[in-house]
Amino acid sequence: HGMRLTPEGEQVYPGLRQAFEQITASLAQLEAINARQTLTVSTEPSFAATWLVPRLGQFSASHPQVEVRVEATALLADLRRERIDVAIRHGLGDYPGLDVQALMAPPLIPVASPRLLAEGPEIREAIDCLAYPLLQESERNDWRLWLRAMGVEDDPRSERGPAFADDLLLVRAAEAGQGIALVREIHARAEIASGRLAVALERPWPSRFAYYAVSLPGAAQRAPLSLFLAWLREQAAAEA
């Protein structure tokens, strides 16, 4: 004999069934949320726009369960306070109390609009760049150091010119014909390939600065960050 509900049971059954279905649906939703892992990456706008974001689709295709959130900022993120899993920073790799992995050190190259170079004096040596307006990064160090590395004595002109906080802005200013910019090669690659920018002098300079993946101690061993870092190292190695 099958079990039969009492008249009272029949009255409450639809409500109970609905409640159980809701519980089942909520548990399934919770499982889906737990399976979906979020990873927050902080990096500078130029690196995000020209290098990281165009490649992210490959990572997402291989790891669909990981949802990457990219925060592009020129400010150094506080990993603990801002709940950031990994910061990709450009510097000397000196980040006390954090796990640091070197990624790559793109060389600095002088770029300008082809029209500006065609209409201006010929550039054969590094010193010839001083005949043009120089576009500076915020600290106004790169041109001075690059010229010195090329054997040019310190010249006050090496620190003059408008300054920009990010390579993306330097690239845009150079494209607009405002002068010669010294930028990391990876940030001007698309513009050079399309002919919007030209290399003013084939003297790439291996800057002491490099890109580093920085995370909280021990975090790099746990998924999803371990997966992301392995992918990042693989992508960076392909640049070398």
Predicted segments, located by residue:
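Basic, amphipathic "hinge/linker" alpha-helix immediately C-terminal to the N-terminal HTH DNA-binding motif
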Residues: 1-22
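Conserved G/P- and acidic residue-centered "switch" motifs that form tight phosphate/ATP-binding loops
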Residues: 6, 85, 177
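A short, exposed helix-loop element centered on a Lys and neighboring polar residues
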Residues: 24-31
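Immediate post-signal peptide segment of exported/extracytoplasmic ligand-binding proteins
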Residues: 32-39, 130
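Central regulatory/effector-binding core of bacterial HTH transcription factors
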Residues: 36-96
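Short, well-ordered beta-strand segments
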Residues: 40-42, 87, 111, 135, ...
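Short amphipathic alpha-helical coupling segments at ligand-binding clamshell hinges
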Residues: 51, 184, 220-234, 239-240
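C-terminal regulatory
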Residues: 81, 93-208, 235-240
